[in-house]
């Protein structure tokens, strides 16, 4: 029997399709007991659920969100529960209540705790970590770890991060680590960046802007009596730099569309952290001094570099020295 060219083409196409389909089935069968991963699909930065997705019956989660978004209403200078913080809200440092990529989000909190804290040298629970923020970033006092408010904050963090695998930080978690400069970050240059970019919201003296009913800050104070203290994570300029690069100005920047350069971010971070703020007793922090972050501004250190260089850089020589010490 003589086949037409068209018939031959159709027949070959059918055979090819069957073979391809069989290979796909075989591939799935071989991986039936494993998670099928397509390496050609790039990882997408983590975004958290927004408050409108909280179910009506999840009242504890809703309270947790409100405590993070409006902390000062409950615990600030005129707090309805207690007057134990500086008037800032958790949301002032954790963008949109901790749901934005590289916005100091809460994606990795649940999967990270309990864990050994380098800062305290002890195992730390989520509640203890939260209270650390109350004492340092909010320059206040710890709340009862068994209180409804603490349980609500933890419930919200579980709601945000329960889908994150244990010990696997998602892309976009926390704060982006910017490349080190080849020089020290410069507060004088940073002041110019602050005046051009930050001052319109945070005020010329970094005092911030209170909300309409003065129950908290719409734009938080960056230094001074009502800002974070010297024990806070933001008293390390790498954290401030990574945060402002991807999130500031608040109404303009995103990680996809930053408004300032890496260099400007480092310099404005140096300017902000060169300003006066409440002091925190850090003498018991990092009992193992080899665990101190490179930009922790308080000695002693395992290396010979000064507190000034540990605060502002340049950090590359410190990084190289630490690597050599660890090899020995």
What are these regions (language model features)?
Residues 12-23:
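Bacterial N-terminal signal peptides
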Residues 63, 129, 133-169, 256-287, ...:
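C-terminal capping alpha-helices of c-type cytochrome domains
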Residues 77-127, 208-249:
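Gly/Gly-Pro-rich "capping" loops immediately C-terminal to redox-active cysteine motifs
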């Amino acid at each position: 029997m003589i086949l037409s060219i068209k018939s031959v083409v159709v027949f070959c196409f059918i055979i090819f399709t069957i073979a391809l389909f069989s290979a796909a089935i075989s591939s799935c069968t071989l991986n039936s007991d494993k998670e099928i991963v397509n390496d050609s699909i790039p990882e997408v930065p983590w975004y958290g659920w927004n408050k409108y997705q909280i179910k009506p019956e999840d009242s504890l989660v809703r309270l947790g969100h409100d405590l993070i978004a409006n902390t000062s209403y409950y615990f600030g200078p005129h707090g309805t529960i207690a007057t134990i913080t500086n008037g800032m809200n958790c949301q002032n440092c954790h963008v949109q209540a901790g749901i934005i990529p590289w916005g100091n989000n809460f994606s990795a909190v649940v999967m990270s705790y309990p864990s050994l804290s380098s800062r305290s040298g002890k195992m730390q629970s989520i509640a203890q970590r939260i209270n650390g923020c109350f004492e340092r970033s909010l320059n206040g006092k710890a709340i009862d770890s068994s209180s409804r408010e603490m349980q609500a904050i933890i419930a919200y963090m579980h709601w945000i991060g329960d889908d994150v695998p244990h010990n696997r930080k998602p892309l976009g978690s926390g704060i982006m680590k910017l490349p080190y400069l080849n020089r020290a970050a410069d507060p004088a240059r940073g002041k110019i960046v602050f005046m051009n970019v930050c001052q319109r919201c945070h005020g010329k003296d970094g005092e911030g802007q209170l909300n309409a009913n003065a129950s908290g800050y719409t734009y938080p104070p960056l230094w001074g009596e009502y800002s974070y203290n010297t024990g806070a994570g933001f008293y390390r300029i790498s954290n401030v730099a990574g945060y402002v690069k991807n999130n500031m100005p608040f109404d303009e920047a995103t990680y996809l569309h930053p408004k300032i350069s890496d260099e400007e971010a480092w310099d404005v971070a140096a300017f902000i952290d060169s300003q006066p703020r409440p002091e925190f007793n850090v003498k018991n922090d990092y009992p193992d001094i080899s665990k101190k972050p490179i930009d922790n501004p308080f000695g002693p250190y395992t290396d010979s570099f000064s507190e000034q260089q540990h605060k502002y850089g340049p950090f590359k020589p410190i990084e190289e020295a630490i690597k050599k010490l660890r090899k020995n």
